[in-house]
Amino acid sequence: MSALHTLSLAAIRDALARREVRAEDAVLDCLARIETTEPRIDALLHLRAEAAIEEARALDAAGPDASRPLWGVPVTVKDALTTAGTPTTAGSRILEDFVPFYDAFAVQRLREAGAIILGKNNMDEFAMGSSTENSAYKPTRNPWDTARVPGGSSGGSAASVAAGQCFASLGTDTGGSIRQPASLCGCVGLKPTYGRVSRFGLIAYGSSLDQIGPMTRTVEDAAIVMGVIAGHDKRDSTCADRPVEDFAAALASRHDLAGVRIGVPAEFWGEGLSPEVATSCRAALDAARDLGATIVDVALPHTPQSIAAYYIVASAEASSNLARYDGVRYGKRAHAPEDLMDLYVRSRSEGLGDEVQRRIMLGTYVLSSGYYDAYYRKAAQVRRRILEDYRNAFATCDVICGPVSPVTAWPLGALTADPLQMYLMDVFTLSLNLAGLPGLSLPVGLGTESGMPVGIQLLGRSFDEATLLSVGNVLSRALPPLGSPAGLR
């Protein structure tokens, strides 16, 4: 069987289980694909080639195990998740020497399920960015056009999946960082409900916003990975102790969209939305209607305020989370400091990038005496209103649908000098994180002008990923496939 990297995760899993393919063959095929594509897209920071081959050989020697749903499947992981024995930098110079001795919960679950981790993906530093240009090491490029961004902050994961370097990747989503790069790179991305997946081992950005989720080439593949990584973990006090649904069974139970009410918020379809994105997303809604869905209007009136609220809340949490990286106990230490204050200042100034420093300063400011009520408390109040908006909307619909990004992937460097414009790229994704609800991004076509992927997002009720996945699976199967990335042909 040739070109294994073109298969879906479900297909390679089944081939491995039937011993039509060896785990070593799957790993070697992905490594060959990495060798071919990596110089053009820079999606990886760390590669575990030799270790992955050894792990594959050990699996082959033991034979397939039906109790391990990802047996022999090569995957990658965003570099914000700790991996025992493999560097974990979060895309930052301040952590370039950090090699953890433990796995993140989600990584542990992957290994227990039989997955083989090929490497760690590039990302915006500490997940702060929308283009993966804020990585301290290198920018990642979009496989569909290597002169354009892949999105962020999980841009390395999205690029790896789209390029066929792996069959799935784990990303993180604090304000759209799974859904937006998935949209820009033409793959599927699932942001679970807050608390569905343990954050143990995740290098934190915004602790009340961060979630870990799968990035894959099909909705079915996302359901498979989601079934592996979801579950309670006592090491994360915010992780929900509740049963995990059989997501694969949920997909199998739905064959059309009859009876499904899809809410369309006007706030997602107004000013700033490019015509080519609007055209592709409306065509997807038409397809949903043809499949039996009922399209209803809903309102999310506080969407315009979500950007300000998000950057206040997220920056405040980041300033607290990143305070530990001072060169004393955590983080790379500046060379030959003159005194303790010089150690603090130089370690953080040399180790942290401009965008991270900008958000730390903003977060420290909004939490400072005299400004807390004016900024942070108001942002928290807006956050509550946003959750109420979603609850009111779900009283009349089952899922909410809208564009993921207002535009398709933009040229590298086009927005780096304008942070505010970069922040606006997340206008449709931020509110979901503030509400803690699940969202699924799936590709719906190529832009009529740019020729780049366009994604649509389905937003759901708390802990109702099963509905999102089943609806998304039916819809995605009715849409024409994107084909292989044009930038790598």
From Swiss-Prot:
GO biological process: translation
Protein name: Glutamyl-tRNA(Gln) amidotransferase subunit A
MF annotations from Gene Ontology: ATP binding; glutaminyl-tRNA synthase (glutamine-hydrolyzing) activity
Annotated catalysed reactions: L-glutamyl-tRNA(Gln) + L-glutamine + ATP + H2O = L-glutaminyl-tRNA(Gln) + L-glutamate + ADP + phosphate + H(+)
CC annotations in GO: glutamyl-tRNA(Gln) amidotransferase complex
Active site, per annotation: K78, S153, S177
Signal peptide positions on this chain: none
Keywords: ATP-binding, Ligase, Nucleotide-binding, Protein biosynthesis
ATP-binding in keyword set: yes
Gene3D superfamilies the record matches: Amidase signature (AS) domain
PANTHER family in UniProt: GLUTAMYL-TRNA(GLN) AMIDOTRANSFERASE SUBUNIT A, TRANSAMIDASE
UniProt keyword DNA-binding present: no
Role of this protein: Allows the formation of correctly charged Gln-tRNA(Gln) through the transamidation of misacylated Glu-tRNA(Gln) in organisms which lack glutaminyl-tRNA synthetase. The reaction takes place in the presence of glutamine and ATP through an activated gamma-phospho-Glu-tRNA(Gln).
Enzyme Commission code(s) on record: 6.3.5.7
Complex formation: Heterotrimer of A, B and C subunits.
